[in-house]
């Protein structure tokens, strides 16, 4: 029996549903989600394997006009996948008209010379007539291999999109073991789950100014719990105060919510200890970016 495999990048502007789509395909949380733009900062690999095929999805940071060194890293990280994949899923929202950000991405895709499938997400939010207008508009911008409307949140048409990808795959190797779902280490996934709760519970400038560093992660042989010590990094003292909250209430809530998700992922009881530290302007300092996991060599 022949086996098919290939690498597929998921590209698009911030907040179009790329991570929601990946998590739905994988059947579990691989990439964190929030309603904040630029939630995904690193390339996230999701490995979808059946008896007949393996699709290695690469969820990328939302492409935007960068204002910091972190933003530069995110955009470069997204575009670098064009050199690594067999197919690109270019995702746009059905409830927003094509904008400058979409046009910028389209120009890069035209030059990349890789097959592109246009994925119009959030179809549950629009009338069919509006969807048809969106399809016609994008069809006139470039020659897409396919145009597929979906709702990643509700799962509408997602399996059809996966089937289309399989049809376009060529025979190849199984690159990863069947039970492996991502290439990121557990420490990275743990840090992302903590950051997700910060994004969920805070507002304004806080989400963009936060990084999470896992200082230690080890099993206690007596209690059989996994002890995790994590530091939430911010850029200003005022941000530190907001995350800690009145009498530590906000930090406690972040820890409780994150611990539940981490326990589900690891399948073990977890003792999570969180601290908050200030590192001024870390998003514009390359050494800090590397220390906090935004390293071009790795992701």
Swiss-Prot record:
Query: Chief subcellular site?
Result: cytoplasm
- Tell me the GO molecular function terms: GDP binding; GTP binding; GTPase activity; ribosomal small subunit binding; small ribosomal subunit rRNA binding
Asked whether the keyword Hydrolase is assigned, the reply is no
Annotated region described as G2, given as residue ranges: 38-42
One cellular component (GO) term of this entry: cytoplasm
Which keywords has UniProt assigned to this entry?
A: Cell membrane, Cytoplasm, GTP-binding, Membrane, Nucleotide-binding, Ribosome biogenesis, RNA-binding, rRNA-binding
| Coiled-coil segments | none
G1: annotated segments: 12-19
Residue ranges for the region (G4) are 121-124
**Limits of the KH type-2 domain:** 202-280
Give the UniProt subcellular location, in the record's own words: Cytoplasm; Cell membrane
Q: Check the record and name the CDD domains matching this protein.
A: Era, KH-II_Era
Question: Where in the numbering of this chain does the Era-type G domain appear?
Answer: 4-171
Activity regulation per the record?
GTPase activity is inhibited by GDP but not by UTP, CTP, ATP, GMP or cGMP.
A GO term (biological process) for this protein? Answer: ribosomal small subunit assembly
SUPFAM superfamilies associated with the record: P-loop containing nucleoside triphosphate hydrolases, Prokaryotic type KH domain (KH-domain type II)
Q: Which family does it belong to?
A: Belongs to the TRAFAC class TrmE-Era-EngA-EngB-Septin-like GTPase superfamily. Era GTPase family.
Functional note = An essential GTPase that binds both GDP and GTP, with rapid nucleotide exchange. Plays a role in 16S rRNA processing and 30S ribosomal subunit biogenesis and possibly also in cell cycle regulation and energy metabolism. Has GTPase activity, binds both GDP and GTP, does not bind UTP, CTP or ATP.
PANTHER family from the xrefs? GTPASE ERA, GTPASE ERA, MITOCHONDRIAL
What's the name of the protein? GTPase Era
Tell me which species this is from: Streptococcus mutans serotype c (strain ATCC 700610 / UA159)
